[in-house]
Amino acid sequence: MIVQAAGGIRVVVTLKDHRLDLEAMARAITPMTKLVFIANPNNPTATIVTAKEVEEFMARVPDRVIVVFDEAYIEFAQGPDFPDSLAYMKQGRKAVVLRTFSKAASLAGLRVGYAVADADCVALLNRIRQPFNVNSLAQVAALAALEDDSHILECLRMIEAGRHFLSDEFTSLGL
């Protein structure tokens, strides 16, 4: 939707073994490319691209191209191999990091998330966003979630228990 709204042409790069193919994504970048999206962890495959893979990819991305890291599921993928996407912003790269309160904080119905970006990008986003895109209740809930680590940990524990339950039930059905 973002690409179409901006009058751009979307280029889809096929997954390789259920993972983002950063090599193919780098090859797909042309002089017309303005934006690249990396969903990490990927949805729906839950696979990640590692810090090393992202570093190699970023070395091939021209400085003029904005790299958007969609990290909606970041709380489910912490570990030593997971890239620090915020570091690219600190290095002065054109990067945007998107995160949400929908998943780990269980606030999906409130439709609240955030972007971390440089001032120029934020100014651009403010020009195209809806004027009242996050209601007051969602803002209060998001702020409360930021201050309540135990809530996030409990939500993650419950989600993990649900995953194990589903896996066990599918196994018992022979699926």
What residue ranges belong to the model's regions?
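Short beta->alpha connector loops at strand-helix junctions that form conserved
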Residues: 12-17
